[in-house]
UniProtKB/Swiss-Prot annotation:
The modification N6-murein peptidoglycan lysine is found at K79. HAMAP family: Lpp. The keyword Coiled coil applies. It comes from Salmonella typhi. This is Major outer membrane lipoprotein Lpp 2. A lipid is attached at C22 (N-palmitoyl cysteine). Induction: This gene is probably poorly expressed. Its main location: membrane. It is a lipid-anchor; Peptidoglycan-anchor. A highly abundant outer membrane lipoprotein that controls the distance between the inner and outer membranes. The only protein known to be covalently linked to the peptidoglycan network (PGN). Also non-covalently binds the PGN. The link between the cell outer membrane and PGN contributes to maintenance of the structural and functional integrity of the cell envelope, and maintains the correct distance between the PGN and the outer membrane. PROSITE patterns: PROKAR_LIPOPROTEIN. InterPro entries: Lipoprotein_leucine-zipper_dom, MOM_Lpp. A lipid is attached at C22 (S-diacylglycerol cysteine). Sequence repeats lie at residues 25-35, 39-49.
Amino acid sequence: MNRTNKLILGAVVLGSTLLAGCSSNAKIDQLSSDVQTLSAKVDQLSNDVNAMRSDVQAAKDDAARANQRLDNKVFRICK
């Protein structure tokens, strides 16, 4: 190979390497963005679960009070 062909081949190899590096950086940036998005979704789901816990506890308390009222009525009827 003459000198010109070697320079062209070297430039092509260097260019390909640089493009591959840019592609990897773009993929890393995309993955980083995806991780941030997923982290935000996990935080939102965690907040939703915590909000539901208080709702579930309130429902349990209401059910317990209703059961107690029913038990009291049954006890009075059976007397």
